[in-house]
Amino acid sequence: MTVQSNNKLASQVCEACHVDAPKVSDEELKELIGLIPDWVPQVRDNVMMLEREYKFKNYKLAWAFANKVSELAESEFHHPSILLEWGKVTVTWWTHSIGGLHKNDFICAAKTDQLGD
């Protein structure tokens, strides 16, 4: 992954998303995931999601990162699932209102990556 490609997404702002907003197409998924290759598309309960696991030296560092992700979520008005474990945080982005992936999820994933820098 290049920093430049990640910044292309991270510099964007999430748009308000409604129930009738379009999910990303298969073609868009391939293009966008190429900008954030550490993220893995997952399907759970027939819902496509983006997931990434971050590793840390201890619980306190993982906790601090989870708090940063929470602050990002509040600032973007877009909220992921955050699983905090000893030395590990798993972040999962998807758009609840459309039951799948929207461009906002990729923007937030790229911004999440920058929190670790």
Swiss-Prot record:
Q: Which Gene3D superfamilies match?
A: Transcriptional coactivator/pterin dehydratase
- Which InterPro entries does the record match to this protein? PCD_sf, Pterin-4-alpha-carb_dehyd, Pterin_deHydtase
User: What EC number(s) has UniProt assigned to this enzyme?
Assistant: 4.2.1.96
Q: Which residues form the signal peptide?
A: none
Q: Is the Lyase keyword given for this protein? A: yes
**Reaction(s) catalysed (UniProt annotation):** (4aS,6R)-4a-hydroxy-L-erythro-5,6,7,8-tetrahydrobiopterin = (6R)-L-erythro-6,7-dihydrobiopterin + H2O
Give the family per the record.
Answer: Belongs to the pterin-4-alpha-carbinolamine dehydratase family.
Q: What protein am I looking at?
A: Putative pterin-4-alpha-carbinolamine dehydratase
Q: Which organism is it from?
A: Colwellia psychrerythraea (strain 34H / ATCC BAA-681) (Vibrio psychroerythus)
